[in-house]
Amino acid sequence: MTFDTMKKLITIAASLLWGAALFAQQALVPGSGIVSPEINADNTVTFRYYNPKAVTVQISGDFLPSQKITYVMDGQERVWEAPGKADLVERNGLWTFTTEPLKGELYSYTLYVDGQKTMDPSNIYQNRDIATWTNIFTMSTEKGDKGWYYEVQDVPHGNVSKVWYDSPTLGTQRRMTVYTPAGYEKNTKKKYPVLYLLHGSGGDEDAWSDLGRAVQILDNLIAEGKAEPMIVVMPNGVYFNQAAPGVAVNMFQPTITNSRSQSTEEVEMSFPDIIRYMESNYRVRKDQYGRAVAGLSMGGRQSAALSRRHPSMFGYVGMFSGVVPPEEDDKALEAVFAAKPKLYWIACGKTDGVMVNSLLLKEYCESKGYPVSFYESEGGHIWRNWREYLTIFAQKIFK
């Protein structure tokens, strides 16, 4: 056998091996060749799932008419808007469903195959909400709509760090997410204001950056000049958990129903540990009007409680679907407004079970002549609202 013949045989063998490896690799990727979801020109969205053995396939998503579920929490009846469901139609083993035209937004969904929850194998984009995983997609119908702010745009980008810090108050190390705006590394003489952004019950330090799209929102608002360049600190507000599942020292199942996580006292007492760490390790402003605190649901209550315990700590307070109801003669709330916050902002959805307490706080503040701002949106206790509230709140602070 000549050298040239041997060289050709080796080349052919290598090509065959490469092709086989590529085929095997593609076979390991579920849903290869199927596009799902597909955003159509008319702003409808088509979902596809191939399974010739399935009897029924349904989709559950927050783009469908919601199911209203009533439950009792803290002795109050509340309404949860659960995602609606729809049936996929099968043809030759391929199941499909197309939505009505949708508005710009971030949407979540899951599939149910013969009653069993299944992730869409053709969609690699997923989010975890407490202990529940869903597929997600974003869509924007025009620049400046909600979906546009939630997507990565061609603008200067900030950086995101997962930071461990010592909490002497709680006697442990804890983890938080820190966003620094574009230019932070270059503007070495500038000190930045800080927004402390708190998650809800069952959440963790990843919630606002993942589900809340806080990073994309801040990048895009700052690039447009609609928000001041700021650092955003997203701590873990469940005091007995070090960090999110998978990065803490213990294995645990996050849950929204754990009553221990609803306590605000431990967070109030240990929060100065976070501020001291930020002021020692980042270039931040150290005055009242260089700090803001805001949060959703439990994080809203924690924000309200923090402003009561430390009235002069924050110049801006935001409560998204979560407040501390006022007492008859609320001296702690009186101290908050005596410290002259520039913004005391309450936001809630019309069908949110927390609306009752939100209105009570609003009306109490108004009866005392306290300068309170109130924002009412459609919908209930859902991430769609909390992303919107952050987008609005971020444009109001540090100005």
Which residues fall in each region the model found?
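Bacterial Sec-dependent N-terminal signal peptides
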Residues: 1-27
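N-terminal edge beta-strand
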Residues: 25-46
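Feature targets compositionally biased, intrinsically disordered low-complexity regions
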Residues: 18, 30-32, 92, 236
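Non-catalytic cap/lid and distal C-terminal segments of serine-dependent acyl enzymes
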Residues: 39-399
